Amino acid sequence: MNFLLCIFKGVYVIKLIQRFFKLESAGGILLLFSAVVAMLLANSPLSNQYNDFLNLPVSLQIGSFSINKTLIHWINDGFMAVFFVLVGMEVKKELFEGALSTYQQAIFPAIAAIGGMVIPAVVYWFIAKQDPSLANGWAIPMATDIAFALGIMALLSKQVPLPLKIFLLALAIIDDLGAIVVIALFFSHGLSVQALIFSAVAIIALILLNRFKVSALCAYMVVGAILWASVLKSGVHATLAGVIIGFSIPLKGKKGERPLDDFEHILASWSSFVILPLFAFANAGVSFAGIDVNMISSPLLLAIASGLIIGKPVGIFGFSYISVKLGLAKLPDGINFKQIFAVAVLCGIGFTMSMFLASLAFDANAGESVNTLSRLGILFGSTVSAILGYLFLKQTTKLS
């Protein structure tokens, strides 16, 4: 009898887990859970074990070629490159077939996204300009964590109009493109010509695979791995390799199959339920030990938080509103400016993407206090944006 009861309970638990992973908000919930666990560990008696785990040396060697990094660097440079493969595929799909495939569809979210990148950077600069050592952090509040933003929106999925969801997706995709450009232009250092040549050869190989509409995903994975390793060694940030790999995968194969859709389907679950939660676990572990009032009012924390809470909504809403009033773009049918403002506030959730940019802007040499304050600013700004965004979205969609 006890045995049967155990089996029944096991089946019930499995069904609950399956139901959870089918939720639209599952990815966002798992992200939040990972971040909370990281913060609890970082402020518990297990903090040393948590940090030691993240700093475990992990090596990869093939003949004379080797990559030696700590676990946290493998997560940030390796796993996040896989995430950017997905970003590259999503951008390509939307540009050729989706919400960004025509000028009329693309111009409104494009202008909004530009505002959402420029104004947060300006807000950051205005607050942090008194300290030249903080100049590198201007890109941190530019980012939007699309998984989290969509997770919050999914909580109200039944009352959120479809055009508003499409606007958020298009906005986030253009935002990702902006982040890619920023990483390429401002966070690549000490370039190696030899590694860049290897990277160029790998890119040519990917172009040929795409040109001949090769559908075998293993071919892209092998060449992509070579490209990632070459880019990593070149001094250009390795996540750019992910974007190039994503763009190289064909939308259609020779026999009408859809390689990009197949690979996107595989990576989407890994990204939502493994890669991003793991990144959050590795980077959200902020220790509050030794933090006083003076640190909380520091220019760095205020600049990042203000960029996310104020800069994002002002930039997105302001640019989109002006573009419509000047006749440069048209407000999508089925939504209003109050809902655009709610989405703009929601885009202040920088979380994992802002933390990723912070890890590039301030390395270990910047000092523990700088890294701690930047993460605190991101967590505070993202939390406030999530709460306000949810409340505004709930109110505006209810009114509609």
UniProtKB/Swiss-Prot annotation:
- Where is the protein found, in the record's own terms? Cell inner membrane
> Its Gene Ontology biological processes?
regulation of pH
Bilayer disposition of the protein? Multi-pass membrane protein
From the UniProt record, list the reaction(s) this protein catalyses.
Na(+)(in) + 2 H(+)(out) = Na(+)(out) + 2 H(+)(in)
Entry keyword Membrane: yes
Q: What InterPro entries has UniProt attached to this entry?
A: Na/H_antiporter_dom_sf, NhaA
Q: Which keywords describe this protein according to UniProt? A: Antiport, Cell inner membrane, Cell membrane, Ion transport, Membrane, Sodium, Sodium transport, Transmembrane, Transmembrane helix, Transport
Gene Ontology cellular-component annotations: plasma membrane
Q: Where is the major localization of this protein? A: membrane
Its annotated function is as follows: Na(+)/H(+) antiporter that extrudes sodium in exchange for external protons.
PANTHER family assigned to the protein according to its UniProt record, in alphabetical order: NA(+)_H(+) ANTIPORTER NHAA, SODIUM ION/PROTON ANTIPORTER NHAA-RELATED
Q: What is this protein called?
A: Na(+)/H(+) antiporter NhaA
Q: Which gene encodes it?
A: nhaA
